[in-house]
Amino acid sequence: SRQAVRICRLFGDNLTQRVTTSVGPEQEYFIVDRETYLKRKDLIFTGRTLFGAMPPKGQEMEDHYFGAIKERVSNYMKDLDIELWKLGIPAKTEHNEAAPAQHELAPIYNTTNVATDENMLVMNVMKKVALRHGLVCLLHEKPFAGVNGSGKHNNWSLTTDTGHNLLEPGR
């Protein structure tokens, strides 16, 4: 904070006394049917496939990313929202991602240390809620060859105690 305040002074801001970081992690994940998952020892033991054929269909965006969320996954997402709300973690968006069976959850940003703790809770809750729906949530960064993996985009900001976001684009 001290060095950030020094930079603020160089730009003529004499009011700022403290700068804090905040982050909004976007958690990507794959959802698979539990019965299918249980047939794959590689998925069970490593969280990813170690052998197998390439998928018959790629990740054409028009039919997955922009497609409707499947009812079973939608029900999972609704239940997940409820469980996260109970913990005080509201989600801003949930949607399909580029690869088949891939999705994303983006909680509301928070101060960095709190957002990090919340993301650990989010990942645990995602797995537990999936099991209740007969699904398995895969958080491995690359569980399937030949399609996009799951990343975690982190949207950062530096905010002054006067409420100014230092990373907001200027005019």
Show which residues each predicted segment covers.
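Glycine-rich, acidic/polar active-site loops that bind/position phosphate-bearing ligands
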Residues: S1-L139, F144-R171
